[in-house]
């Protein structure tokens, strides 16, 4: 049979080819790059805090990120904890850090190095090793409008970048932390000009290594933040717009942009930075940072799923998928929210995956890790499940389980530690729910239940040791327990504690006897969740 031909193509084949093109155009679309931000600014226990990780932990995380579907990683290693001039020990730490970049490259990831624009610590901080320093109480804001102060700071920054010279991009946030009231966009631009000069002089591939402004709250803002009725996201607009207007014509090539947004429109910066970036015509240079889509910050460690937030944020920005340079997500303690990382990466690569039911997403991740669905899925959901949804033997079965998948080999801290963490969290959740579910017929019952509930919550805190911006000597506080648990305990106490003083005294003695808290400390903490009146 003779077939009609067009430009040498048989008509049938031409129709098939055109149909394939149309299907591809109408089919699953996604962002061309997916990145993940590792925040090393918090000091608490391994492997929860990224700052506690070893060289091998970072190498494993990069391999895991690659298998989850990411192709970029950004680290904030807190070089701002190194005072000028660099000590021999700090210089060696920077040399060693280059291996971290090599490990990211070995995993097939681009490595972006994050820095703040103008923070530096005093020499006194160097009394401790770099990774053990807490700079938050002692940081100084360098005045970039003071030529002498700026020159000294840029010389110190250049000395560090001379050593850590192999990153694919050098990212600097616009002022959180950093900045100062009245700061001008020209001063923020001067940071990138200085970084460009340092890269051109010392970089391993200066024609490819980008400088990237992280647009977050606007350079020069003064308490313009919060996202409430008196402090809406729109208040940062003039600051961000002025910065973008200065960056556009002033940035040295090669450069990109990292506009960040909050996980909801009416909070913090909302979508202001993305909107202004598009209006400025800078979307093709931009990677969109969907901050807190994966996990809130700061956040107490816990298996909290944010699938609906991830869906909403990625769908919000899907309009830019074809024109922007990709997306980034972040988490404070990635080992606790691996399901969120997985869903973010899969959904960003293929937007149709966002329609996948939650249970199926968790099952898919369990399969990728090579672990039993019937154990991992309820463990990942434990913070949202009632007591009857958490079998009594789940912790022991988790501890006996194994992850046979290749991806499961690369969880920071190791798969055995990971499964033990999940088991400990389930134990805490079960212990807490059991305590507040038991009947109370007298003050002795109330004291026993109050002590048991507190013991469960403090027990989980001792596993992770989260203290916000504190250090290892920071004592237990209810602010280190998730709000939903504290609120539930207060509601229980209000309904069940009648003889307040007697109940608190007896519960405190029980907590002291078990070694949970000292008796005096326990009395103070219990009084906070069982207030009088």
Ranges and model annotations:
Residues 1-11:
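Bacterial N-terminal signal peptides that target proteins for export
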Residues 9-19:
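Bacterial N-terminal signal peptides
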Residues 23-40, 48-53:
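N-terminal carbohydrate-binding accessory modules
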Residues 39, 57-59, 71-73, 83-116, ...:
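Catalytic-core regions of glycoside hydrolase
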Residues 40-47, 79-82:
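Acidic/histidine-rich, surface-exposed loop or edge segments in extracytoplasmic proteins
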Residues 51-79:
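Catalytic domains of carbohydrate-active enzymes, especially glycoside hydrolases
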Residues 352-533:
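Catalytic domains of carbohydrate-active enzymes that cleave complex glycans
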